[in-house]
Amino acid sequence: MAISALIEEFQKVSASPKTMLAKYKAQGKKAIGCLPYYVPEELVYAAGMVPMGVWGCNGKQEVRSKEYCASFYCTIAQQSLEMLLDGTLDGLDGIITPVLCDTLRPMSQNFKVAMKDKMPVIFLAHPQVRQNAAGKQFTYDAYSEVKGHLEEICGHEITNDAILDAIKVYNKSRAARREFCKLANEHPDLIPASVRATVLRAAYFMLKDEYTEKLEELNKELAAAPAGKFDGHKVVVSGIIYNMPGILKAMDDNKLAIAADDCAYESRSFAVDAPEDLDNGLQALAVQFSKQKNDVLLYDPEFAKNTRSEHVCNLVKESGAEGLIVFMMQFCDPEEMEYPDLKKALDAHHIPHVKIGVDQMTRDFGQAQTALEAFAESL
């Protein structure tokens, strides 16, 4: 299949998650909403259910969620709750709500209260000190509890063999997405910022085996494609999420292609595979989480060395990017607290960057357009 045809298929999925949810429900499958961050989707997949990403939405008018949310909650949390309240996500059979930040922690209880008569809400508490034996055991126990709740929803046991099989499916998918990011950097003429974001976003709304099969086909076509002409600029993007239509249009208009990303919604979520040489599936998933790093949401035992900021700087250099765009989610405390150290490292490495505030309620992207245009001209 041609590259353009494959991209069009991903665009259809990305543009209409509700259609995908309805499709899977029509097949008799149950679906579980997975909120940010680091949900062990393998457990949902192993249960024979469909994991559906719930990371807010763009431009929805908040009405009912304001009754539950403080004004300083990020719009990812508010928009996710709004969709649950207004019926957009009524097809879900439950949701998993991790609590890795100070907004999601109290928000998990808002989800529980708001959804008490509609669907089960599964609480997931990851440990911050996750690398040692106690941290891995904590993660194991937390995942085991999630597994029990999922078994209540699906109506049968989630076997260890099913989890091990799911890990293989997900590792294959993560590898395909990492390869796609590499190929997108090699073909900015074929994969502009909006297309790259669309292809990666589609993973949240498809069963991973189906998604990976289609993505591997796209990767094969990209690998065989000749190098094209690109007269724009390559950049690295960093932040929680940035795929608002206005932002992506502004990047495409100013010929800013993405060489690599340091985003929670994208590469951070598929950077680490689960080991396949362990006999216990839950243990393998706990080990996987223990190896997650370079994320503002996670405790870094080597924080004094500013390892995360150095990681971002190295990402810019190794990808061949000319600069960095920091997309700062409004009211995201971890991102805001990290920025001074990140800026210091970027300046020390003489890496041009621009910081742009993003919000899922934004309707006028004129300010972002101007900032991106000025940044492109400065490169």
Curated annotation (Swiss-Prot):
Q: Which locations, inside or outside the cell, does it occupy?
A: Cytoplasm
Q: Does the keyword Iron apply?
A: yes
Q: How is the cofactor bound?
A: Binds 1 [4Fe-4S] cluster per heterodimer.
* UniProt GO cellular component terms: cytoplasm
Q: Name one GO molecular function term.
A: 2-hydroxyglutaryl-CoA dehydratase activity
To which pathway does this protein belong?
Amino-acid degradation; L-glutamate degradation via hydroxyglutarate pathway; crotonoyl-CoA from L-glutamate: step 4/5
Q: How is its activity regulated?
A: Activated by the HgdC. Reversibly inactivated by oxidants such as 2-nitrophenol, 3-nitrophenol, 4-nitrophenol, 4-nitrobenzoate, carbonyl cyanide 4-(trifluoromethoxy)phenylhydrazone (FCCP) and chloramphenicol. Irreversibly inactivated by oxidants such as hydroxylamine and nitrite.
Q: Which GO terms describe its biological process?
A: glutamate catabolic process via 2-hydroxyglutarate
RNA-binding is among the record's keywords: no
Keywords, ordered alphabetically: 4Fe-4S, Cytoplasm, Flavoprotein, FMN, Iron, Iron-sulfur, Lyase, Magnesium, Metal-binding
Relate the assembly described in the record.
The (R)-2-hydroxyglutaryl-CoA dehydratase enzyme system is a heterodimer composed of an alpha subunit (HgdA) and a beta subunit (HgdB).
**UniProt function note:** Involved in the fermentation of L-glutamate via the hydroxyglutarate pathway. Catalyzes the reversible syn-elimination of water from (R)-2-hydroxyglutaryl-CoA to yield (E)-glutaconyl-CoA. The dehydration mechanism involves a transient one electron reduction of the thioester from (R)-2-hydroxyglutaryl-CoA, generating a ketyl radical. Prior to (E)-glutaconyl-CoA formation, the ketyl radical is subsequently reoxidized by electron transfer back to the HgdA-HgdB complex (CompD) to avoid change in oxidation state of the substrate.
Q: What is this protein called?
A: (R)-2-hydroxyglutaryl-CoA dehydratase, subunit beta
What is the gene name? hgdB
